[in-house]
Swiss-Prot record:
It is found in: Cytoplasm. This is Regulatory protein RecX. One of its GO terms (cellular component) is cytoplasm. GO terms for biological process: regulation of DNA repair. PANTHER family: REGULATORY PROTEIN RECX FAMILY PROTEIN (PTHR33602:SF1). The gene is recX. Belongs to the RecX family. It comes from Actinobacillus pleuropneumoniae serotype 5b (strain L20). Modulates RecA activity. HAMAP family: RecX. Keywords: Cytoplasm. Disulfide bonds: none annotated.
Length: 151
C-alpha cells in the first residue's frame, strides 16, 4: 500500500466501513499525505457521495443504540468524531428511537435481584453512564422490585 495515492487509500478505507470526515483526515495525515492531496481526496469522496457525515452519523446512532447506548452518550461520542451539533440533533430526531423503551430494556437487563438503596444508586450511575437522561429511567427507580406481585 505504499504506492497508494490519497484517493486510493481513502477508497480502500471506505470500502471496509463508513468514516467521519475527521477520522478520514486523521488516517490520511497518519499516512503522511500532503494537505493538498488530503483536501482533494476528501472533496472528491464527498462530491461522489462516497463519504457523508450524515450517513455516518445515522449509521452510528442506529448501531450504538442497538447496543443500549442513550442519546447523551451518542452526542458525546459523535462530537469526538467531528460531527457537528446540528447534524447530531437532526439525526437523533430522525432515528425514530423511543429512548424510554430502550432505557427500560437496558434497565431490565441489568437490574439486580435484591432491590435496596445501594442497588438503586448503582443502577442510577449505570444508566447515566450509558447516556440516558434522568427522565428516561427515573420512573423505573420507584417500582418496588422486591414485591412478589411484580415477579
Amino acid at each position: 500500500m505504499t504506492n497508494y495515492t490519497a484517493i486510493n487509500y481513502l477508497l480502500y478505507l471506505l470500502s471496509k466501513r463508513d468514516y467521519s470526515e475527521q477520522d478520514l483526515r486523521r488516517k490520511l495525515v497518519q499516512k503522511e499525505y500532503s494537505q493538498e492531496e488530503i483536501e482533494q481526496a476528501i472533496e472528491r469522496a464527498q462530491a461522489n457521495n462516497w463519504q457523508s457525515d450524515e450517513r455516518y452519523c445515522a449509521g452510528f446512532i442506529r448501531y450504538r443504540s442497538q447496543q443500549g447506548i442513550g442519546p447523551r452518550r451518542l452526542k458525546q461520542e459523535l462530537k469526538l468524531k467531528g460531527i457537528k451539533d446540528w447534524l447530531i440533533n437532526q439525526e437523533l430526531e430522525n432515528a425514530e428511537i423511543d429512548w424510554f423503551i430502550l432505557a427500560e430494556q437496558v434497565f431490565e437487563k441489568k437490574r439486580p435481584q435484591v432491590w435496596d438503596i445501594k442497588a438503586k444508586q448503582k443502577m442510577w450511575r449505570f444508566m447515566l453512564s450509558r447516556g440516558f437522561y434522568n427522565d428516561h429511567f427515573s420512573h423505573l427507580m420507584d417500582i418496588d422490585y422486591n414485591d412478589t406481585e411484580y415477579e
